[in-house]
Amino acid sequence: MSQNLPPVRLVALDLDGTLLNHSGEITPLTREAIARATANGVVVVPATGRPLASLPPVVAQLPGIRYAITSNGAAVWDLGSDPLGAVYSRYANAAERRTSEPACLLRRLMPAETAREAFALFQQYD
C-alpha cells in the first residue's frame, strides 16, 4: 500500500449500524471521532436510504454536519448553518419554518423507461 495517499477530505457515514448503534444512538467514541475529523477539516456527511425528513435529530444535531446524502444517494442536501431546522423546515408548516429551505445539490431521477421496466418486473411477482 502506498504511503503517499492523499489526505481524507470527506467521510460519508451510513446511519444504521455505522453512525447509529443498535439503539439508534451515536456513541461517545463516535462523537469524538467525528469532532476530531471536522476539527481537521474533514467534511462528515451522513448517508442514508431514508428521505431527508427521516434524518434522525441526533444526526442533524451533530456539530459540523452541513450536508446529507439521502434517498439511497439520489439527493445531496446543503443543510446550511441550522441542519436540524433545515430538515424540519422542508416538511413543516410553512408558517412555522425555522430556517430557509435546504438546497438540493444533486438529485438523480430514474429515466422513465427504466422505471417502466422495473415496474413491469415488479408486476410479475404480484
Segments predicted by a language model, with ranges:
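Mg2+-dependent phosphoryl-transfer enzymes with acidic/Ser/Thr/Gly-rich catalytic loops
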Residues: 2-10, 26-28
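Asp-based phosphoryl-transfer active-site loop
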Residues: 9-23
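Short, solvent-exposed loop/turn segments at secondary-structure boundaries
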Residues: 23-26, 106
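Active-site phosphate-binding/coordination module
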Residues: 30-126
